[in-house]
Regions:
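Nucleotidyltransferase catalytic core that binds NTPs
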Residues: 1-167
Length: 167
């Protein structure tokens, strides 16, 4: 049986414990998992973290997994999947609202690359409400995000959003 490679694409700005959980679960299902960080998201505002910072944050949170590698991309994800020899695209789903968008993308990717399957991994209830945008918002106002991200991500978010001292 040939090795099976999956690709987990995303913006990961910042990576949350929900992202880490989905990637860890994918790592138990596939021989190799490539986490693909989009360099310049087309549909989002300017990322808080650079692509290289997001890669480093993911590598830190996944350092104990020998079968996971993190890289960036600037092309179609189906082209990255072909380049990596991936046969499955793994996407995490938190709620029905995620499904609507991911369902459309899965069909579009199937048109572009019929050989690439999309597999949805349901988030655990602990992470179903956690989003990168929500974490950024809490961090921007000085809130505690330590329950939602790794310690390194929490530190780096605090550095990105220094809080003015009250006088």
């Amino acid at each position: 049986v040939a090795d099976r490679t999956a690709i987990c694409p995303g913006t990961f700005d910042p990576p949350t414990l929900g992202h880490i959980d989905v990637i860890r679960r994918a790592a138990t299902m596939f021989d190799h998992v490539v986490v693909a960080v989009v360099r310049a998201p087309q549909h989002k505002m300017q990322p808080v973290f650079t692509a290289d910072e997001r890669i480093a944050l993911l590598e830190d949170g996944l350092a104990d997994l020998d079968n996971v590698r993190v890289r960036s991309f600037t092309t179609l994800i189906v082209d990255v999947a072909r380049e990596e020899g991936a046969t499955v695209l793994v996407k995490g789903l938190r709620a029905v609202s995620d499904f609507e968008w991911e369902f459309q993308m899965a069909h579009l990717n199937a048109e572009l690359a019929p050989e690439l399957e999309t597999a949805f991994v349901m988030s655990y209830p602990d992470w179903s409400f956690v989003s990168s945008s929500g974490v950024r918002e809490v961090a921007a106002f000085g809130g505690d995000v330590s329950k939602y991200v790794t310690p390194r991500v929490a530190r780096e978010l605090a550095a990105k959003f220094p809080q003015p001292s009250e006088s």
